[in-house]
Curated annotation (Swiss-Prot):
Compartments where located: Cytoplasm
SUBUNIT field: Fourteen ClpP subunits assemble into 2 heptameric rings which stack back to back to give a disk-like structure with a central cavity, resembling the structure of eukaryotic proteasomes.
NCBIfam families for the chain: clpP, PRK00277.1, PRK12553.1
EC top class named in words: hydrolase
GO terms assigned for molecular function: ATP-dependent peptidase activity; ATPase binding; serine-type endopeptidase activity
Chief localisation class: cytoplasm
The protein's role, per its UniProt record: Cleaves peptides in various proteins in a process that requires ATP hydrolysis. Has a chymotrypsin-like activity. Plays a major role in the degradation of misfolded proteins.
Designated name of the protein: ATP-dependent Clp protease proteolytic subunit
Family membership: Belongs to the peptidase S14 family.
GO biological process: protein quality control for misfolded or incompletely synthesized proteins
Keyword list, A-Z: Cytoplasm, Hydrolase, Protease, Serine protease
EC number: 3.4.21.92
One of the record's GO cellular component terms: cytoplasm
Amino acid sequence: MDIENLNQIPIVVEQSARGERAYDIYSRLLKERIIFLVGPIEDYMANVVVAQLLFLESENPDQDIHLYINSPGGLVSAGLAIYDTMQFIKPDVSTLCIGQAASMGALLLTAGAKDKRFALPNVRCMIHQPLGGFSGQASDIDIHAQEILKVREKLNQIFKLHTSQTIKTIQKDTDRDNFMSANEATKYGLIDKVLAKR
């Protein structure tokens, strides 16, 4: 979320016996334990999402947190910071894809608590291997290539853990961009259920 878009964020006014209070819509939804992960996954966004997860855990460690995802993916390190926090905290994190969950967005979608991973009917999910482009000395390029292979193996292990697919299947399916509908994502094990209505 960048500064230019702050003027476009709706404000919600809540009335109580003590008067009125204005919230931006995302802060109001956070009170309902809903976190929005929207847009490219980068360091700033990851820090905000991690902070929200930790805050909601401190507020009530026994109540589910709802993570709504509409993301084309992004940085592996930023995504893994969110992933690790989702697994670390006590509350279950329920995930819901709205729009798209591609690349790291798909990994975070499938990382939700078992039987609490959802998608709306017209979403698109996409999984693939990590991307990287490097220049420099041959030895440095080789170091980066080896690191990408290690990262790929790590991401494949995470997908295996949450989808119950075999490593061999995941390696084949992530070799190129692999797009899925909501129903296909359910069959693959990325999500548990497609939601058409509340």
